[in-house]
Amino acid sequence: MKIERVDLIPISIPYKHAEVSSRVSRGGVTDVVVRVVADDGRIGWGECCSGADTLSIVAAAQAMTPFLIGRDPRDVQSIKRDVFKKGLWDYRVQTGNFTWAGLDMALLDLAGQEAGLPLWRLLGGRGSTEPVSYFCYLARDTSEGLRRQCAEAVAAGYEHFYIKVGIDEAEDERMIADVRAAIGPERKIRIDANEAWPLPVAAKLIARWDAAFDLDFVEAPVRARPVKVMAQLRQRVSVPICANEGLGSETETLEMITGDAADVLCFSSYWVGGMQSFMTLSRTAELAGNKVCKHTHGEFGIAAVAHQHALLALGDGSRGHQQTASVMEDDILQSDIPIRTQPLWGEIDAPGLGITVDADKLDHYHKLFLADGQFLPWAATVE
């Protein structure tokens, strides 16, 4: 089996509501869908994360494509080595990682199809018999709106509730209080400040809000670099600290682990350049006593499925992984993935990623991108 063609299709799908944090304000997700066609007619699917600029990811993927053509898609690691070393993407690591992760998914999809096995089996088989658990992503809202969001999520079975903070202290506190009142004392609350606070403010707010509302963990409360800032905060508070920003490469992620700066690492194959790197660093984090929470920048079903395979293989007992499937207006897969409507997701039986892309939806949301451009991270277009 050899790779004949690589197609790159940027698409935009709106959120049900705007995503608003201390860093971003956007109305939907724009990513680059990857379609890798093999000489036997098989198709592998992937999804590149856009980050700041979609067209730069398209350009990066185009630059990487010559290293794929004519190669066996099962030779993932040697292709990656050529892309980053001969293609010099090791000098543009974050863009390279965001791009390569999507190509990597497509190659692994083809490898699984050729083997007749779901990807999680190629990644080592089930790490646990438990289904993978995902969180409820709450929108910043009025008290009434948050009560409604929480009631629907509790009815659907969610145990982990996540909300963005770091914008307005009083408003943040009101929303956390609303969530705790709505979900009861047993369910978990996680907050994400996206590096909004200086160290003294972070220490004060975390202590106060944990005493009042019992926080499960706090994500990115302070800047991730230098690592000692997070490490100092971790010594000053009793709440587990989660790192996300600052995990932009294999080296940075390893530094966060060895620097004892966080209790939880929130990242994905996008951050570290491919599924094997994500698996390796997740295992390394586990050996160091950390938990791993799968991160999402906002994703379509392709990326969600790919990472579900990885989480099935990891099986480290972490719960409440990140997802945006439940807050997207639509998807491009023919069948809804389970986490569109519920928090739990079990085995995937079909070979490779085990997905079928809806050609009409793919075309529709590609045309939406062509007409309106990407959902910019600083310009929400829906309420």
Predicted regions and their residues:
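Shared catalytic-loop signature of beta/alpha-barrel
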Residues: 64, 207, 214, 225-242, ...
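Structured beta-strand/loop patches that form or line metal/cofactor-binding pockets in enzymes
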Residues: 1-44, 49, 326-332, 381-383
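Catalytic pocket of metal/acid-base enzymes, prominently hydrolases
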Residues: 108-142, 357, 361
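Conserved, mostly hydrophobic/aromatic
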Residues: 3, 34, 41, 64, ...
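Metal- or metallocofactor-binding catalytic centers and their adjacent structured scaffolds
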Residues: 5, 37-114
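Metal-dependent enolase-superfamily TIM-barrel catalytic cores that perform enediolate-based chemistry
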Residues: 124-237
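Glycine- and other small-residue-rich loops at beta-strand/loop junctions that grip anionic moieties
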Residues: 100, 138, 164-168, 194-195, ...
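Extended hydrophobic packing segments that form well-structured cores
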Residues: 353-383
